[in-house]
Amino acid sequence: MKNLFILALLAFTATSAVAQLYTTCSQGYGQCQQQPQPQPQPQPQPQMNTCSAFLQQCSQTAYVQSQMWQASGCQLMRQQCCQPLAQISEQARCQAVCSVAQIIMRQQQGQRFGQPQQQQGQSFSQPQQQVPVEIMGMVLQTLPSMCSVNIPQYCTTTPCSTIAPAIYNIPMTATCAGGAC
């Protein structure tokens, strides 16, 4: 009798879930497609946007002047950028650094041409462009020190266009010649 009750309860719960799904999707196929789908693994882009804004808006001068730095929201941006960066593997940080540098590069290109880069027919899903040395150098010099994280040495010598995109919780492996990376 107890097992029958549990079985009936499970059947009712399953039927309710299916009915709710049907009700939600019965208004049209397009609305079903617009419902957010759960992502099995986190995507890096939101944190990297925060990191690019952090690097561009929170200069070393503002960082040294702590009251101005805190009032400008830099402390919150630093936390939103640095916490996820500290939680990923060093290998994945190399891709994160490339993502930040590319976001900054696209923003600067958009400013140069008077409009955001994405409005010019390019999207973030296209193949990576070569990041200028000045931008990559600024990111590599500033981000690790402001976030107190280590960036692998090969990030300083490997072009971003050759680094495979990483999902942060899957470690990337580097090929090292002679045991040195």
Curated annotation (Swiss-Prot):
Belongs to the prolamin family. Keywords: Disulfide bond, Seed storage protein, Signal, Storage protein. This is Avenin-like a6. Residues 1-19 form the signal peptide. CDD domains: AAI_SS. GO terms for molecular function: nutrient reservoir activity. InterPro entries: Bifun_inhib/LTP/seed_sf, Bifunc_inhib/LTP/seed_store, Glia_glutenin. Seed storage protein. Not integrated in the gluten polymer through disulfide bonds, unless incorporated by reduction and reoxidation during dough making. Increases dough strength and bread volume, but decreases dough stability when added into a base wheat flour. Pfam families: Gliadin (PF13016). It comes from the Eukaryota. Contains 7 disulfide bonds.
